[in-house]
């Protein structure tokens, strides 16, 4: 018997939206006077910081960058977040899936490990806000901490929720350890997976 879900929980980057880091990288290179190797380290430092805390703060991230020798300031971070608000490309099949979900009275949550200031605006510019019922951003809780998954439930029973994301640790292992069903999307299977989910919804 096919399982019926009432809430679908999505990661954002590489799941709903396809990020293009080039403009943001160029902004950082110019404002921080970084060479190519130092620029690459920015993202590994973000990952390191996320592993040390349960939620993001701008001051905390700025301080961590400075500890690592990156001359980040709050103003530069704010400018970077604004620059990245323009990453609004929606993956093929996403809109159709969200339309089908709402057409069948399903609840939709999004969970992201990045700042609300950036991610909410991206969803708005991409035209996806109206489909989403619950938002969990890195300012509130970070995956794979259980608080992130708990907030995404919005009191929906775990067995009625499906988590969908690209990162195996945060979007598959984390949700499953918390008691959620989860499916991984990749560049190879993303469109097929969204078609499959849409078909299952129509068959319920």
Regions inferred by a protein language model and the residue ranges of each:
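Active-site neighborhood of HAD-like aspartate-dependent phosphohydrolases
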Residues: 1-44
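Asp-based, Mg2+/Mn2+-dependent phosphohydrolase catalytic module
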Residues: 1-8, 34, 72, 99-102, ...
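Generic recognition of short, well-ordered alpha-helical segments
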Residues: 20-23, 92, 96, 121, ...
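Alpha-helical elements of Rossmann-like donor-binding domains used by nucleotide-donor carbohydrate transfer enzymes
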Residues: 23-27, 60-64, 96, 100, ...
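Hydrophobic alpha-helical core bundles mediating ligand binding, dimerization, or RNAP-core interactions
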Residues: 24-29, 77-84, 119
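A metal-dependent, Asp-based hydrolase signature
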Residues: 34-37, 47-82
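Short, contiguous strand/loop micro-motifs
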Residues: 48-49, 84-85, 110, 158-159
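Short, acidic loop-to-helix structural element flanking the phosphoryl-transfer center
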Residues: 59, 82-109, 146
């Amino acid at each position: 018997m096919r399982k019926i879900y009432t809430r679908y929980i999505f990661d954002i980057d590489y799941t709903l939206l396809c990020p293009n880091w080039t403009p943001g990288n160029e902004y950082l290179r110019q404002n921080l006077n970084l060479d190519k190797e130092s620029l690459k380290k920015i993202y590994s430092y973000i990952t390191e910081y996320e592993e040390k805390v349960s939620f993001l703060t701008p001051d905390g991230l700025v301080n961590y960058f400075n500890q690592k020798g990156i001359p980040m300031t709050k103003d530069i971070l704010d400018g970077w977040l604004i620059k990245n608000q323009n990453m609004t490309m929606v993956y093929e099949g996403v809109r159709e899936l969200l339309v089908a979900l709402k057409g069948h009275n399903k609840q939709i949550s999004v969970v992201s490990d990045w700042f609300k200031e950036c991610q909410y605006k991206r969803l708005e510019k991409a035209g996806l806000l109206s489909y989403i019922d619950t938002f969990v951003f890195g300012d509130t809780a970070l995956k794979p901490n259980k608080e992130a998954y708990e907030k995404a439930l919005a009191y929906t029973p775990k067995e009625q929720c499906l988590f969908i994301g690209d990162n195996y640790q945060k979007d598959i292992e984390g949700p499953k350890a918390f008691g959620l069903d989860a499916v991984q999307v990749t560049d190879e299977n993303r469109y097929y997976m969204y078609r499959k989910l849409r078909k299952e919804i129509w068959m319920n």
